UniProtKB/Swiss-Prot annotation:
It comes from Arabidopsis thaliana (Mouse-ear cress). GO terms for biological process: DNA-templated transcription initiation. Residues 51-68, 287-296 have a biased composition (Pro residues). One of its GO terms (cellular component) is SAGA complex. InterPro entries: Histone-fold, TAF12, TFIID_TAF12_dom. Belongs to the TAF12 family. This is Transcription initiation factor TFIID subunit 12. Residues 30-50, 103-130, 323-350 have a biased composition (Low complexity). TAFs are components of the transcription factor IID (TFIID) complex that is essential for mediating regulation of RNA polymerase transcription.
Length: 539
């Protein structure tokens, strides 16, 4: 850890004599009397924290100011590095981060030698841009309230401070104007950031943290803001305002550096906007820093050039969102058009056939009108149909028509056919049967003294007189005794069966008697081998 810092600061001429110090106010007083022709970053750094020193340190979580210092091996170089951490930052060099060094959140680390050896113009802009990083809200969601000291990089550099320089650096996911760091500074700050990320284990949003590094004489950030803004040169404020506007236009939670509470109070709303407009913050893993899109990496000094890449993104996003309803509308428009075309297309072919039919009808009328004999044959089928319907009308009025007779005949035997005389006889029998049933049922209804003919009246007549039990209308529930009705044919069959039975019995009796006498005559000399068997088999 010490070697990269010493190498980065080797090119710097020490502006102050090496005087070891134990507290930050002493280091500030040592840096203040150094004269410099150009407003170098070290002079700006020394002037900024020295003015708010007499303010009340009551808001500081740790009341002891000397705990914010670190004993350093090389006092001149290390003091400048520690003081330039929260304040001195490089000029706006786009969002091109050196991610290849695997150093997450290196934008708040110590400044390198090129930063301190810059000219006066970059110094003013760099001194104004980093200060805006401290003015942003220092709230970090999920950060424990108790101070967590980070382990010292080397045994010689013991950090008794409760809030070391790399404590607030690990929660700044996106660069706040100071992401253009050198490789040396990124290498120096990467182990501290990794160690703190390992101990904390909190995946934070990129811009929730703030550059809360070493604070001189127990000052808070809110106390430093008015003094920092008052000590800025006019050029820094003029150059910073368009850049801050550009940051706000990109919804990166970068309020303007002017010390106004209204701008700083909009952090929550900008956090919500950032969560919406920058989904890569929540989707990135915990230990790896999120890579911004390529549109945010190039940074231009002019506000017009900075705002231009954002405008096409808005158009692209809106155009990406609008094609879906446009496509839906176009599909909805195409569907009725297709339906109309489909409706019109059948109508057109139908309209064309109608015309030939009309022409054919006219031709037929012209052809048939002079020819008189052709009309009577056309009228004859109608007359024939009328005669056929007249013949079928009386049969249709009957209960059992010829159609029903043919259907019954087809069910019995499809090959059989009935003569018309037989069909008439069957229809007459059906009519007589229905009339007899209705008359007897009406008589039963009158006997019950009711004007309505019910099903039980007809069932009583049908079951008793005709021995017919129609399915679904049986009267078994109210009629327990059923009288057997025998016909003459049935009686004749029963008589024939009885005669046959008697004849068989008589024949069997004759055969048994003859077989018994023969056995008696032939069995006088010989005894039967099985005398019981003959009797049993005969009987």
């Amino acid at each position: 850890m010490d070697q990269p810092r010493q190498s980065s600061t080797a090119s710097q001429p020490p502006e102050t004599p090496p005087q070891p110090s134990d507290s930050k106010p002493s280091t500030l007083t040592q840096i203040q009397p150094t004269p410099s022709t150009n407003p170098s970053p070290s002079s700006v750094v020394s002037s900024i924290p020295s003015s708010p020193a007499p303010q009340s340190p009551s808001l500081n979580p740790n009341p002891n100011p000397p705990q914010y210092t670190r004993p350093v091996t090389s006092p001149a170089t290390q003091q400048q590095q520690h003081l330039s951490q929260p304040l001195v930052r490089p000029p706006p060099q786009a969002y091109s981060r050196p991610w290849q060094q695997h150093s997450s959140y290196t934008h708040f680390s110590s400044a390198s030698s090129p930063l301190l050896s810059s000219s006066s113009a970059p110094a003013s802009s760099s001194s104004s841009l980093p200060i805006s990083g401290q003015q942003r809200g220092g709230m970090a969601i999920g950060v424990p309230a108790s101070p967590i000291p980070s382990p010292s990089p080397t045994p010689s550099q013991h950090s008794p401070s409760a809030f070391p320089g790399s404590f607030g650096q690990q929660y700044g996911g996106l660069g706040r104007g100071t992401v253009g760091m050198s490789e040396a500074t990124s290498n120096t700050s990467s182990p501290q950031v990794r160690m703190m990320q390992g101990t904390q284990g909190i995946g934070m949003m990129g811009t929730l943290g703030s550059g809360s590094q070493i604070r001189p004489s127990g000052m808070t950030q809110h106390q430093q803001r008015p003094t920092q803004s008052s000590l800025r040169p006019a050029s820094s404020t003029s150059t910073q305002s368009p850049v801050a506007q550009n940051f706000q236009g990109h919804s990166l939670m970068r309020p303007s550096p002017i010390s106004s509470p209204n701008v700083q109070s909009t952090g929550a709303s900008q956090q919500s906007l950032q969560a919406i407009n920058q989904p890569w913050l929540s989707s990135t893993p915990q230990g790896k820093p999120p890579l911004p899109p390529p549109s945010y990496r190039p940074q231009v000094n002019s506000p017009s050039m900075q705002q231009r890449p954002h405008i096409p993104q808005q158009h692209i996003s809106t155009s990406a969102a609008t094609p879906q309803p446009q496509q839906q509308q176009s599909q909805q428009q195409h569907q009725p058009q297709e339906q109309l075309q489909q409706l019109r297309s059948p109508q057109q072919p139908l309209a064309h056939p109608h015309q030939p039919t009309r022409v054919q009808g006219l031709v037929n009328q012209k052809v048939t009108s002079p020819v008189m004999p052709s009309q009577p044959p056309v009228a004859q089928p109608g007359n024939h149909a009328k005669t056929v319907s007249a013949e079928t009308e009386p049969s249709d009025d009957r209960i059992l028509g010829k159609r029903s007779i043919h259907e019954l005949l087809q069910q019995i035997d499809p090959s059989e056919k009935l003569d018309p005389e037989v069909e008439d006889i069957l229809s007459d029998i059906a009519e007589d049967f229905v009339e007899s049933i209705t008359t007897f049922g009406c008589s039963l209804a009158k006997h019950r003294k009711s004007d309505i003919l019910e099903a039980k009246d007809i069932l009583l007549h049908v079951e008793r007189n005709w021995n017919i039990r129609p399915p679904g209308f049986s009267s078994d529930e109210f009629k327990t005794f059923r009288k057997p009705l025998t016909t003459d044919i049935h009686k004749e069959r029963l008589a024939a069966i009885k005669k046959s039975v008697t004849a068989t019995e008589a024949a069997n009796a004759r055969n048994q008697f003859g077989h018994g006498t023969a056995n008696a005559r032939g069995g006088q000399a010989k005894t039967p081998s099985n005398p019981m068997g003959s009797t049993t088999f005969n009987h």
